[in-house]
Amino acid sequence: MIYMASGTHYESWSALPLFDRVASPDHAKDFVPDLNDYESPTFEVDLLSENYDYDNFLTYSLPTVDPTKTLLHEEPLCFEGDFTNPAIDHYITTSSGLLDAVPSQLIALPSFTQPSKCPFPNCKSTTIFESGRDFRRHYRQHFKRFFCRYPDCSQSTQDIMEVGTKGFATRKDRARHESKHKPTVRCPWHDQEGQQCLRVFSRVDNMRDHYRRIHKC
């Protein structure tokens, strides 16, 4: 409650609660990369530093929206054990004719009623999941539902029946894989004449290994 003086009396009002605000929509999930309009990122970190967290390194962003892509329906649609639902074509996201990803709404999830381990067959996780959100995030990673968006890659597909046999469990795994198609991490070594090494890598750790083996005396 806030009080403000006004002449000889006080006026009071209450601040509006913050928890009723609606979250902003996540437009990033509808983005598809334009691989013909790519610019290498500018690095402001020491890629050779021992403390650099290169496991979380991403080599490019996905800035281009595909206006023809079908948006997801708000009501969840689940499968009964496999990806054979006839309505799936309406929900699939695509990139240049390739299957981009199968939405998480299409993965049938066991009901979460109490803290428990993952029930997926042969799951190696020993975590006791305390919330349904953490459980669902883990469970979906058992399904390879993200696919490479480079047409000639063995991890790309146009066939929905290949879901689960190729692809990646997370967007991060797919981004790490796709960086191999267009390496952007250049070796920072320069010779005495100022010429930079021409080797380019898709991963920071691979570049560091090259730098130590070839250039560091």
From Swiss-Prot:
Function description: Transcriptional activator of part of the core trichothecene biosynthesis cluster.
A Gene Ontology cellular-component term: nucleus
Any one GO MF annotation of this record: zinc ion binding
Protein name, entry field: Trichothecene biosynthesis transcription regulator TRI6
Compartments, record wording: Nucleus
Top-level taxon of the source organism: Eukaryota
Zinc finger residue extent: C2H2-type: 185-215
InterPro entries found in the cross-reference section: Tscrpt_reg_Tri6, Znf_C2H2_type
Keywords: Metal-binding, Nucleus, Zinc, Zinc-finger
Disruption phenotype: Reduces transcription of TRI4 and TRI5 and does not produce trichothecenes but accumulates low levels of the trichothecene precursor trichodiene.
One BP annotation, GO: regulation of DNA-templated transcription
